[in-house]
């Protein structure tokens, strides 16, 4: 069965709402627990750093939208971030949920046999790698970078890691991305996914991760990804996917 990757948020044209949006607030342990409940094999998260160099899980660069704090997380000390309420905005029953530290997420994932996809935002790459290694989770993490130079730097720092993801817009971009970044996993939007795209990725020994994201019904798109034999399907609604296809294997 296809592993499913669940984000800690989902994107729409007008707003950002949490992964499994009817279940739990993003960037919290409650969100992780909901993924565990539904058997999600891989949790994608955005990693950013505090003023005192502690890594947190937060999609936005600021705390305003999902906590009772304001301003950039990079200007906050971890001792203060840890006091913020990251759940009340979503529903009263989640009052008191905290912004999730990467360390706590890694430990929870290790306990439950989950993979974590790290979407790097800022902070020391070496510090990030050391933290993941210290928690014994390097072999259970995927890595993705929005900036090409960060991906290249990461590849040089950790050549042994075989889970570097790279966004590829279309089939014609595969050669360039492979040459420049040497990725292990091709990430592609479902609308750009074709049989030839998958074939070319296989020729380069790339796994394929299909992005099937958004708030609307994705039944047809999910089936397309399954039929084309992708390795991972990223979804904002893991509970619906698993209801149809069953719990994934990691």
Model-derived segments and spans:
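Phosphate-group recognition and catalysis centered on beta-loop-alpha active-site segments
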Residues: 1-250
């Amino acid at each position: 069965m296809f592993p499913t990757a669940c984000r800690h948020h989902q994107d729409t044209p007008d707003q950002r709402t949490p992964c499994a949006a009817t279940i739990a607030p993003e960037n919290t342990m409650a969100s992780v627990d909901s993924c565990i409940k539904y058997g999600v094999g891989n949790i994608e998260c955005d990693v950013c750093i505090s003023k005192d160099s502690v890594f947190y899980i937060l999609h936005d660069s600021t705390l305003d939208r999902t906590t009772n704090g304001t301003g950039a997380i990079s200007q906050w000390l971890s001792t203060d971030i840890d006091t913020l309420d990251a759940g009340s905005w979503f529903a009263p029953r989640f009052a008191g949920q905290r912004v999730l530290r990467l360390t706590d997420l890694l430990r929870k994932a290790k306990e439950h046999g989950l993979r974590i996809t790290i979407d790097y935002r800022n902070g020391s790459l070496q510090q990030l790698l050391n933290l993941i290694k210290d928690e014994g989770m390097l072999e259970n993490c995927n890595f993705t970078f929005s900036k090409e130079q960060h991906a290249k730097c990461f590849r040089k720092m950790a050549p042994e890691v075989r889970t570097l993801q790279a966004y590829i817009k279309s089939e014609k971009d595969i050669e360039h991305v492979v040459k420049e970044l040497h990725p292990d996993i091709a990430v592609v939007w479902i609308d750009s996914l074709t049989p030839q795209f998958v074939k070319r990725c296989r020729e380069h020994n790339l796994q394929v991760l299909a992005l099937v994201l958004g708030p609307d019904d994705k039944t047809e798109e999910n089936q397309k990804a399954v039929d084309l034999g992708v390795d991972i399907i990223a979804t904002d609604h893991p509970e619906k996917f698993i209801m149809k296809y069953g719990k994934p294997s990691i």
